[in-house]
């Protein structure tokens, strides 16, 4: 999971979150981020390029248990695994989840939905038929929040003045779902769930294709400390290479 040129430091906080320090020495760049999960991180260990964690979480049984987990780039959710099934019914989940666990499921470029494990299985046939494999786990919401967007004009800086963010342009790579919110956390979030399709029909459905390129979002409202909050509502692929923000006053 960490076969990368950057340097990392992982610190377990008292509240069960992980503070992650990220550094690229050659470019003189560094920063912090916070990792959260549906449960509490207990301890963490790196073995060469692999990262393991002990997490205290409820698997649906109503009892908090300790699980040894590994971070992997190809898993779209926490406490996630690949499960086989037939006709979009995925059974034998009790090896991972207890009955009554509320989980999310994805298949390829599709978000199948939120399900409650019952009888050791979930049934996604009403969403998409004919599936034999799916990722099932607990989703998390990646969130990127900018500092207050400021600008300097001929009369001086706009700090403290009511400002609007009418437009945000994201430079996306292989992205299937993203949402943009601003100028404050109470503003309406603008979701982009990719609907591009290929000409290939699988199981009666046109397959979606990820978007690479620049996508524009229009926002409403004013704030004295306008920010842009980027997140997503569905556990699908998301990569942001850059952001352009337009400020009006």
What are these language model-derived features?
Residues 1-249:
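Beta-sheet repeat architectures centered on beta-propellers
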